[in-house]
Amino acid sequence: MYSVLIIGGGPRTLMDLRGRLLESMRSRGHDVVACAGGEDDDVEAYLRGIGVDYVSLPLERTSLNPILDLLFLRRLVMLTREFQPDVVLAYNVKPVIYGLLAARMSGVQRRYALITGLGYAFSASASIKKRLLSGLVSY
């Protein structure tokens, strides 16, 4: 059996979009910890009900503040070293970037990214923030 850390952007997606995956992992006997930016009592109750631990993270999904991003990375490194997962699966852009970096820094060998859609970075807008983010994500 594996220990698995799932890192997502928002807690609701853990239930709505990844719920069946989490249930399947648990039914196969894997230890699963799920984390995302923010708290949601319904999601936490659902995850507890299927045997998944939930950790709320300090994630500002659309912020470009490097200090907040470093705090997010620091918390991910602490969580990854504490849980010592065999596998890390991250989805959404910031969790992928910082989650997989934290996993690598913590010595996790199996690191996986899941990016769906184009997201905020590629939405129609001419703002400087979006152009910078689009360039970074495309790199």
Spans of model-derived segments:
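Active-site proximal beta-strand in glycosyltransferases
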Residues: 3-5, 104-120
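Active-site charged/polar residues at nucleotide-handling catalytic sites that mediate phosphoryl
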Residues: 50, 83, 106
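Short His-centered aromatic/hydrophobic patch
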Residues: 90-96, 115
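Nucleotide-sugar donor phosphate/pyrophosphate-binding loop at the beta->alpha transition
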Residues: 17, 67-74, 109-110, 119-139
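Structural detector of well-ordered beta-strand residues that form the stable sheet scaffold
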Residues: 33, 89, 111-113
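Proline-aspartate-enriched helix->loop->beta-strand connector
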Residues: 80, 84-86
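N-terminal strand-loop element at the rim of the active site
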Residues: 5-68
